[in-house]
Structure formats: C-alpha cells, structure tokens
C-alpha cells in the first residue's frame, strides 16, 4: 500500500555559485540543489522557516518527499545532505536526490497494532508496551508501505513481539540485522508487585532452610 507522500514546495533559484547562494540567504531563503534521475541538476531554494520546521520535526533525511517546483514536473526526492553553519548550527544549504520507482531507500515506517480486543493478555489486565513505534526499513521508492501491522490476537501476558513476527512488505527489509523487539505484553503493576513479593518470600524461605 503506497504511503501518502508529503509535498516539499521549493522555488527555482536564479543563478548558481556562492553569490547566488548568499543572495538567497539574505532573502531569508536556504539555497539547495536537486540532482540525479537522468536530469540536469536544478538550483532551488526554500523559505528558511519552512526548512527549519521540517528539520525540527525530525526524519528529514529519511523521508520521501514529492518535490513541487513551479514550471517543473513533480518528482520524488529524498534529502542527501543539509549543510549547517558551524557556529549557529542553522541550515545553510541542502541537497535533494531524485528517485526512480525502483530506487532503494531507507525510511521509517510506523507500526500499527490491531485486534487489541482479541488479545488475551490485555483482557487480563496486561499492558501493551511499545518499544518501537516506527521501524527503519530498506524499501523501494515506487512501493512504500503505509505501515507495518502487528496482530495482537491471542497474545498473552509475557509475550514479546520481535521484528521476525511481523510480515514485511515484499521487497523490504529492516536496516538492522538482529531480531529486535517491537513490543511486549507486560503484567499489570499490581500483579508484578504480588509476584515480586512471592519471589521475595520464596527467597527468604530458601535462605532459612
């Protein structure tokens, strides 16, 4: 299922080189360039506040965007670099790369948990503890999944859900090789306390013997 790709609206930048870049910054714009995809590089610029907001939101360099530039066809891009001022740590330039539908990219995909009402552990008062709300996958640009689905049907207290338990979209794989944890069904705090007390009593009895 294709994800809804966010738009990134930029403007064509008049001229290239340091002079044009400085002129853009004086106008409160951040200069950039989009390259790749069997097309010539295109000098672009984006309002400073717009880029800063995107950067603060996170995942800017791992989000697929639909680049919209007046006078040019929309194209899918991903950020390859954001240069920053060494003193102020604020963006001074950015690079975007055009993608083909067959391009492989790393993206964070959200995880959705379904059938909570069929989860035995939750019915008994257990708590769903989400370790990873997103998972970074290597995906194909033309077939980006909207989400990963975890079915909680039949899960009991103490069950741990690993990435190997999740059906991944065809052609995608995690960026991490190990079988990491997505979530678990933990015991309610009251039950944990009772178990801890019982374990403590058992230990005391064993010591007395």
From Swiss-Prot:
**What biological process terms from GO does the record include?**
translation
GO CC, sorted alphabetically, is: cytosolic large ribosomal subunit
- A GO molecular function for this record? structural constituent of ribosome
**UniProt entry keywords in alphabetical sequence:** Ribonucleoprotein, Ribosomal protein, RNA-binding, rRNA-binding
List the Pfam families hit by this protein, alphabetically.
Ribosomal_L25p, Ribosomal_TL5_C
Q: Does the keyword Ribonucleoprotein apply?
A: yes
Cited Gene3D superfamilies: Ribosomal protein L25, beta domain, Ribosomal Protein L25, Chain P
Give the Acidic residues compositional bias ranges: 196-209
Whether Isomerase counts among this entry's keywords is no
Where are the disulfide bridges?
none
Residue numbers spanned by region Disordered:
190-209
What family is it from?
Belongs to the bacterial ribosomal protein bL25 family. CTC subfamily.
The UniProt subunit note reads as follows:
Part of the 50S ribosomal subunit; part of the 5S rRNA/L5/L18/L25 subcomplex. Contacts the 5S rRNA. Binds to the 5S rRNA independently of L5 and L18.
Record's PANTHER family? Answer: RIBOSOMAL PROTEIN L25/GLN-TRNA SYNTHETASE, ANTI-CODON-BINDING DOMAIN-CONTAINING PROTEIN, RIBOSOMAL PROTEIN L25_GLN-TRNA SYNTHETASE, ANTI-CODON-BINDING DOMAIN-CONTAINING PROTEIN
What function is annotated for this protein?
A: This is one of the proteins that binds to the 5S RNA in the ribosome where it forms part of the central protuberance.
Official protein name in the record: Large ribosomal subunit protein bL25
The species this protein belongs to is Ruegeria sp. (strain TM1040)
């Amino acid at each position: 299922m294709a994800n809804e790709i966010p738009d990134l609206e930029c403007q064509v930048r008049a001229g290239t080189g340091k002079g044009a870049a400085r002129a853009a910054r004086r106008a409160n714009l951040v200069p950039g360039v989009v390259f790749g995809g069997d097309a010539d590089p295109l000098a672009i610029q984006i309002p400073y506040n717009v880029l800063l907001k995107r950067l603060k939101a996170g995942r800017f360099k791992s989000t697929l965007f639909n680049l919209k530039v007046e006078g040019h066809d929309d194209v899918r891009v991903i950020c390859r670099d954001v240069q920053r001022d060494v003193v102020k740590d604020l963006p001074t330039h950015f690079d975007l790369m055009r993608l083909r539908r067959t391009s492989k990219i790393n993206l964070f995909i959200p995880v959705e948990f379904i059938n909570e009402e069929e989860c035995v552990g939750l019915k008994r008062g257990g708590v769903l503890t989400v370790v990873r709300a997103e998972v970074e996958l290597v995906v194909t640009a033309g077939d980006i999944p909207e989400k990963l689905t975890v079915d909680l049907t039949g899960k009991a207290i103490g069950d741990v859900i690993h990435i190997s338990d999740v059906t991944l979209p065809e052609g995608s794989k995690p960026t991490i090789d190990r079988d990491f944890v997505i979530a678990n069904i933990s015991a309610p705090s009251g039950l944990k306390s009772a178990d801890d007390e019982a374990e403590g009593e058992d230990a005391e009895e064993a010591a007395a013997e």
